[in-house]
């Protein structure tokens, strides 16, 4: 019998039945095959312009480096996904190890078969890029023109045999040739047929074109007939491939990686075809997405190394009673503890208890956007977009609602049930502007509507009243305003794409170094660390002035409070005079009745001559603890005088 923490969590709360299964949403398997063109133009290095930021590697090297870096990321962060590299236009041909000379797919070289990337695959690709280890003369362009239908048919076979049941299969084509079959209509027609076969198979073709200064990539010549647009794709989103330019200030590698990363993770809906009721009799269908989700390191697992090949240990869970007898599932009942007793339910009763109506998103009213406080969020927001699959015209109605909410600066209040047995949630429907709209302040988020979960009355906790902090002087505020204005982020906005999680990246780098037998990095690259030199250069003088002003204000405030305490103590002194002690009558040092006397006694060192009773009376009047022996009382009183007088 083995035990897993997540098993106990499911047994305790059964939350998996009540919430959308986000783990399934995140871990759908994906298969990506890179198809990289090997031609003379792809092998040609860019001209040396003397610019340090200009490209130095050929387009082919940049494409292979991009595939290498993506493979490095996936080998750890997405261990269930498959990836492969196919070179086309090569002089040599190779399909698989057992397929002879690859005559079935001429000028196609399967460099890395579509599979879960292993350390050896990454090392092989790294040697080809960094060391220039091309002993097999793989990167030699063919003398004959490439036949694109052969490459597409080869990719078809790779996906069919290696990733037949994958939910997402994609072919990434990297090339600088916009018309591989110029003047050959038969070859173009054959390639279009093969592309249609891939589309029918469920494979999405993504093109990453490379243009040069003297030649712009023209999609209409060939690739418009190869790349199939998804008819059910979200309206309003451009699906045109982004062109990477070689030879300009922005390196080709960075451009390729940016374009590929934008399509690296396929769009997976969090829920699909959810009825969205805007009014009685007016319903459209929507899809939900989770654009923002906190990434955590992959879970560790137990590995058995007793055999030739290490194997992941398969865990099993069993329920036992007090006598260590295994309890069958039919003997178990689910229940809740109530009033010291366990209230048990049958499965059908429990299902009925969870039934809160059909899945829906129903608007119940509207409010000004300013009426929704920033703290009223209990979960992460869900991005919704229209779907035409169930209700034709959903896009137009959805767009009208979005534009109206933006125009009037309002939000919708809605009742949200994600699925049949899910808990209902009250949500605010927030509109987001276009990414290129500066007033929207969301250049990295899509335009549309967001479901912003709101708390119920049961979710609001009572908090003890906290007094507001004292208001600082206006001079301090004005001086600090200059500091803040000079330390603002670009465009006064936080862009999460520029700040990778340092702990997550460090975790992956260590695993990568172990897997690839590389040197362990000395320190992690943390871009969240403050740039102290730049901060000092910008606001060092302002901060020094502010600190001097703060010290002056604090000193003035301390003197004012000390004078006020002394004035109040003198006013509150009783009219009846206490009988002087013998020591006072004889001219000895009596107790200090005022702050001035107390300070004088401290300077003369006569506090220790007071009795314990006198010390306690003075300390009690000052709010100082009177516990301890005489030496402790004297020391505590001297410290108070030194700090306050």
From Swiss-Prot:
Q: Where is the composition biased (Acidic residues)?
A: 11-22
Q: Name one GO cellular component term.
A: chromosome, subtelomeric region
Tell me a GO biological process for this protein: DNA recombination
Q: Which domain of life is it from?
A: Eukaryota
Question: What name does UniProt use for this protein?
Answer: ATP-dependent DNA helicase II subunit 1
- Describe its assembly: Heterodimer of mus-51/ku70 and mus-52/ku80.
What NCBIfam families does this protein's entry cite? ku70
**UniProt organism field:** Neurospora crassa (strain ATCC 24698 / 74-OR23-1A / CBS 708.71 / DSM 1257 / FGSC 987)
InterPro entries associated with the record: Ku70, Ku70/Ku80_beta-barrel_dom, Ku70_bridge/pillars_dom_sf, KU70_core_dom, Ku_C, Ku_N, SAP_dom, SAP_dom_sf
